UniProtKB/Swiss-Prot annotation:
PANTHER family attached to this UniProt entry: ATP SYNTHASE (PTHR15184), ATP SYNTHASE SUBUNIT BETA, MITOCHONDRIAL (PTHR15184:SF71)
Subcellular location field: Plastid, Chloroplast thylakoid membrane
Keywords for the protein's UniProt record, in alphabetical order: ATP synthesis, ATP-binding, CF(1), Chloroplast, Hydrogen ion transport, Ion transport, Membrane, Nucleotide-binding, Plastid, Thylakoid, Translocase, Transport
EC number annotated for this UniProt entry: 7.1.2.2
InterPro entries hit by this protein: AAA+_ATPase, ATP-synt_VA_C, ATP_synth_F1_bsu, ATPase_a/bsu_AS, ATPase_alpha/beta_chains, ATPase_F1/V1/A1_a/bsu_N, ATPase_F1/V1/A1_a/bsu_N_sf, ATPase_F1/V1/A1_a/bsu_nucl-bd
A GO biological process held by the record: proton motive force-driven mitochondrial ATP synthesis
Native species: Pelargonium hortorum (Common geranium)
Nucleotide-binding as UniProt keyword: yes
NCBIfam families given in the database record: atpD
Record's protein name: ATP synthase subunit beta, chloroplastic
Length: 498
């Protein structure tokens, strides 16, 4: 940990003692800076441009060194707008990479790529900071034991379980419940694992970032009265930011998460929305730096950049960072280099279905499209694996029969198929669950369902023990005992009506 050289105020004396250079060229967000002989900054060093623009406004722009050009010149990428900068302006080499505040002071706050608060709630304690560029943990520090990361969400834990310290891709369009699922995961990791979360908004809409913040305050994930008791830190570098900021905001969020893992020894959830925008920003910067483009116009360093981010997201003997990354697939082309490079790093995929959301089944996780490398008998055990496979087979058969049902009706099916359909409909409804963060608008109390309870519930449905219960008894309940209680309640209500 070190004092943060980039967080100093424009007149701070600590910056005045550093090496000084001058701007010699400005091309959009890219600056060429000349330094005296023997005073060249290192790659990834933070440079600060200070001065006044043509109308006398104070300028304070932080840049990051990307290339050494020769002739005592460096090329740097700006982390904020370069409006008002001029050739000949003074540039200060801070002598260190960008550093951002870390630790408990970050919880409940919103930061930009430089680790500066942007939520108008006053300054943040930045005595403890950490550089955003680091090496991944050494092999000897890694925790190689494969273990399930229990989320308390039935459909995820049973059919596409998350790996502790793994990376999960979240696929889903607008309005299918991505934000609510993210908030529920943040809530559950705090309650069940004593962990915290870091949300990195990378190149997405500012409106969505604002909506997420407001919903987090409403649901209690961010505690307005006692900010330190919040469960999440937010880091935003949205669509309106220059490409340099969008390219580095993921690393800022990851650096905050690493501190919770390595120093506080906590389990951390790191959300990146959207990992594609990280690649897109890298592509823009690559073109501005004059590199030859690679396949489909992407940067030639695509795999290296993705690897340098993803390899830092892992489990160590101290704690874990489990990452959930929203993946935008351009033109639905899964072979596009950006999503294809991302897939190589993922351990599981959670696919949200518009069809299920339209039926009112939330979370709208598609049980057949969602996958996980953890769903193997040697990892999850034979019972879990067999129940998950039988659930998938039942739902798959129901899917195959839907066309016949639509044309001919249920009566034309065989006895066996009718039983399969009845159980599949119960399973489909039992995969729904009331969320803690959705209590505000559903009126139902949230439920955390342990993995053993989830397996027991689906085993009982598949074994036929609940063939006599109505399917609506399984909708929006926690464990199977709640479903039987709901069935009795429904029966009483129908008897009273008679």
């Amino acid at each position: 940990m070190r004092l943060n050289p980039t967080a100093s105020s424009p007149g701070d004396s600590t910056l005045q003692k550093k090496k000084l250079g001058r701007i010699v060229q400005i091309i959009g967000p890219v600056l060429d800076v000349a330094f005296p002989r023997g005073k060249m900054p290192y790659i990834y060093n933070a440079l600060v441009v200070q001065g006044r623009d043509t109308v006398g406004q104070q300028i304070h722009v932080t840049c990051e060194v990307q290339q050494l050009l020769g002739n005592n010149r460096v090329r740097a990428v700006a982390m904020s707008a370069t409006d008002g900068l001029m050739r000949g302006m003074e540039v200060i080499d801070t002598g260190a990479p960008l550093s951002v505040p870390v630790g408990g002071a970050t919880l409940g706050r919103i930061f930009n790529v430089l680790g500066e608060p942007v939520d108008n709630l006053g300054p943040v304690d930045n005595r403890t900071t950490s550089p955003i560029h680091k090496s991944p943990p050494a092999f000897i520090e890694l925790d190689t034991k494969l273990s399930i990361f229990e989320t308390g969400i039935k459909v995820v834990d049973l059919l596409a379980p998350y790996r502790r310290g793994g990376k999960i891709g979240l696929f889903g369009g607008a309005g299918v419940g991505k934000t609510v699922l993210i908030m529920e995961l943040i809530n559950n990791i705090a309650k069940a694992h004593g962990g915290v979360s870091v949300f990195g908004g990378v190149g997405e809409r500012t409106r969505e970032g604002n909506d997420l913040y407001m919903e987090m305050k409403e649901s209690g994930v961010i505690n307005e009265q006692k900010v330190a008791e919040s469960k999440v830190a937010l880091v935003y570098g949205q669509m309106n930011e220059p490409p340099g900021a969008r390219m580095r905001v993921g690393l800022t969020a990851l650096t905050m998460a690493e501190y919770f893992r390595d120093v506080n020894k906590q389990d951390v959830l790191l959300f990146i929305d959207n990992i594609f925008r990280f690649v897109q920003a890298g592509s823009e910067v690559s073109a501005l730096l004059g590199r030859m483009p690679s396949a489909v116009g992407y940067q030639p360093t695509l795999s290296t950049e993705m690897g340098s981010l993803q390899e830092r997201i892992t489990s160590t003997k101290k704690g874990s960072i489990t990452s959930i990354q929203a993946v935008y697939v351009p033109a639905d082309d899964l072979t596009d280099p950006a999503p294809a490079t991302t897939f190589a790093h993922l351990d599981a995929t959670t696919v949200l279905s518009r069809g299920l959301a339209a039926k009112g089944i939330y979370p709208a996780v598609d049980p057949l499209d969602s996958t996980s490398t953890m769903l193997q008998p040697r990892i999850v055990g034979n019972e879990h694996y067999e129940i998950a496979q039988r659930v998938k087979q039942t739902l798959q058969r129901y899917k195959e029969l839907q066309d016949i049902i639509a044309i001919l009706g249920l009566d034309e099916l065989s006895e066996e198929d009718r039983l399969t359909v009845a159980r599949a409909r119960k399973i489909e409804r039992f995969l729904s669950q009331p969320f803690f963060v959705a209590e505000v608008f559903t009126g139902s109390t949230g439920k955390y369902v342990g993995l053993s309870e989830t397996i027991r519930g689906f085993h009982l449905i598949l074994s036929g023990e609940f063939d006599g219960l109505p399917e609506q008894a399984f909708y929006l309940v926690g464990n199977i005992d709640e479903a039987t209680a709901k069935a009795m309640k429904l029966e009483k209500e129908s008897n009273l009506k008679k």
